[in-house]
Amino acid sequence: MQLNSNGWHVDDHIVVAVSTGIDSMCLLYQLLNDYKDSYRKLTCLHVNHGVRSASIEEARFLEAYCERHHIDLHIKKLDLSHSLDRNNSIQNEARIKRYEWFDEMMNVLEADVLLTAHHLDDQLETIMYRIFNGKSTRNKLGFDELSKRKGYQIYRPLLAVSKKEIKQFQERYHIPYFEDESNKDNKYVRNDIRNRIIPAIDENNQLKVSHLLKLKQWHDEQYDILQYSAKQFIQEFVKFDEQSKYLEVSRQAFNNLPNSLKMVVLDCLLSKYYELFNISAKTYEEWFKQFSSKKAQFSINLTDKWIIQIAYGKLIIMAKNNGDTYFRVQTIKKPGNYIFNKYRLEIHSNLPKCLFPLTVRTRQSGDTFKLNGRDGYKKVNRLFIDCKVPQWVRDQMPIVLDKQQRIIAVGDLYQQQTIKKWIIISKNGDE
């Protein structure tokens, strides 16, 4: 049984995840024998999930085996009682906790590569699992031989080796191992695929499960193309404020993307900047219908902290205003520089004193201002509509009134002609 040893070097500290099953024990045997000169140091990690009674016996067996072969061994016992009590998917919970511990130990050991015993049959099983449960469209279809984790790499040297070859190797060299009885229980989906579905396909001479590997290769190439296209789109069209985590993108440019690419773009943005994961395809599709509607403004709640705002031609992700304090009314009695919500007001000393005190407030129903250069008045609300000002900006924008309570400025959109040089309003942070 030949390992693919391209994933580590002769001066590497390699770590093997050993369950005591036939796959990992055969991998360990090969590393101790035919591949003993391919690394600098070898360490074993073993996880006791604490679910089966045989777990204690397996851990003791591995301790004795590693002591006999002078291998450092670290064992972790997981507490999965919470998942058992709530009837959650214990396999998924165990995997998450297992890899959290692997991350921790690889850092503690300052090791280079973690080896796992995933083999060809595991690959085929995973491909089928992801196709059948709908997780194939936004993930790679199976395992990569080499993948990156936090500060180290995971390598799968048995990925081209079949289960049949592993069994033959074990029988030839009488390698000790433990059989996990739960692997025979078809109530677990992966077991059902492994024990029932794949053998049924193999019995049909016109079908070959191995063709799934060609599908994986094609699928993963398309996946990489989508990832690249999403990054290109983000670089070209997305504006992001790191401090406030305010994100803005052209609504039209986003709507022009195919749905598959839209999902990847949002996956990238929401996971990277907002730590939001696993939003369903169905939810995304509902959003896309709203994004492409003719409605000029609306909002979608992401979480209790984040919201998507659609404002005319922009798609915006921003913090909710809940809990934020905004000025509603402010009195200015003399020239100077002032901050009102997210705006900076520069009141020059040349502004006629008869206009003081100034009142700065947010909009009110029925607000109007005198048009510059012609007779008549215009509603502030109509100005907002004409300038396509988003609702939440309207709620914060400063409206300046003189001593007689006449509107002489509306944010950075309007200043009365006679005082234009002496009241300058800009968004706070703008140059």
UniProtKB/Swiss-Prot annotation:
GO terms of biological process kind: tRNA modification
Name of the protein: tRNA(Ile)-lysidine synthase
Catalyzed reaction equations: cytidine(34) in tRNA(Ile2) + L-lysine + ATP = lysidine(34) in tRNA(Ile2) + AMP + diphosphate + H(+)
Free-text note regarding domains: The N-terminal region contains the highly conserved SGGXDS motif, predicted to be a P-loop motif involved in ATP binding.
Chief location category: cytoplasm
PANTHER family: TRNA(ILE)-LYSIDINE SYNTHASE-RELATED (PTHR43033:SF1)
Localisation per UniProt entry: Cytoplasm
InterPro entries: Lysidine-tRNA-synth_C, Rossmann-like_a/b/a_fold, TilS/TtcA_N, tRNA_Ile_lys_synt, tRNA_Ile_lys_synt_N
Function as written in the Swiss-Prot or TrEMBL entry: Ligates lysine onto the cytidine present at position 34 of the AUA codon-specific tRNA(Ile) that contains the anticodon CAU, in an ATP-dependent manner. Cytidine is converted to lysidine, thus changing the amino acid specificity of the tRNA from methionine to isoleucine.
GO molecular function: ATP binding; tRNA(Ile)-lysidine synthase activity
Gene3D superfamilies: HUPs
E.C. number: 6.3.4.19
Organism lineage string: Bacteria, Bacillati, Bacillota, Bacilli, Bacillales
Organism, scientific name: Staphylococcus aureus (strain COL)
Taxonomy, superkingdom: Bacteria
Keyword entries, A-Z: ATP-binding, Cytoplasm, Ligase, Nucleotide-binding, tRNA processing
Binding site for ATP: 19-24
Annotated family: Belongs to the tRNA(Ile)-lysidine synthase family.
GO CC terms in record: cytoplasm
